[in-house]
Amino acid sequence: FSYLIAGSLLYRDQRTMSELASAAIGQSTLLAKGATEDQAMAFLQPIVIDTHALNNPWLNYSVYLCNTLFPGILMLLIYLVTAYTIGVEVKENTAKELMHMADNSIVTALVGKLLPQTIIFFIIAVFYNVYLYGFLHYPCNSGIFPMLLAGLLLVLASQAVGIFFFGLFGTLRLALSAASLWGVLSFSISGFTYPVMAMHPTLQALCVLFPLRHYFLLYANLALNGYPLIYAWHSVVALLIFMLLPFFVLKRLRTIMLHYIYIP
């Protein structure tokens, strides 16, 4: 399915047109030489091929595009909003007040700040899933509930990456820049427009570092192919691993919130 990009579909249509034009010339030549129409068709096309595309028989490019583009945009927004939500506390000099309200617990502070956003982002994920599979009737052979679970995992993994970026760089501007870069690269390297197996081996190894890649694999295995969730366990585990990233920067985050001073 990842090969069925717009260029491939256009090439297929143009090739079909050229073959039909060539066949029309050959048919006219055979008819002029006295062959019957049946004899001409049997000579031009002795074997008739009847092909049916699996899981997307309409070859609707939107089916391949929107099911990853929508969550990709949501993921990018989550990166930016999460990093900004934490960084703005330092920028506005309210980080110490937040930590005081959380009894100097960075975990409590992060949960209090980000949990409402998690709920809102998950509602957005539910909305686009219902819109794609319930309203537009895009193929969803596994049922909508596994895709809702995949959406929740993507939301949590994206928030974890946003926290990690701010904890890693320690400044709002660098965290937002890194989040923007990582989010934009996700669209190219996730595999829904260009197959990962055709990429350079280095990029094939790096693609696992992007949450959108694992969400795309979940979509392909669950919604398109209709496999049970157990057969996509590796993608689920990968998204769960992304959720562990904040634990590597918790100590640094606490130091930032308590002691860092924002420099314009």
Residue positions per predicted region:
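Short, surface-exposed helix/turn micro-motifs that flank interaction/cofactor sites
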Residues: 2, 109-110, 166, 216
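Hydrophobic alpha-helical transmembrane segments of multi-pass membrane transport proteins
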Residues: 52-132
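Juxtamembrane loop-helix boundary motifs flanking transmembrane segments in multi-pass membrane proteins
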Residues: 41, 50, 54-58, 98-111, ...
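Short amphipathic alpha-helical interaction/hinge segments
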Residues: 26-29, 78, 94, 126, ...
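Low-complexity, flexible helical/coil segments
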Residues: 18-25, 29-37, 84-91, 109, ...
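Short helix-terminus and kink motifs of transmembrane alpha helices
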Residues: 12, 80-88, 92, 159-167, ...
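Transport-system extracytoplasmic interface segments
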Residues: 1-81
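Membrane-spanning alpha-helical segments of multipass transporters and channels
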Residues: 119, 123, 127-131, 139-264
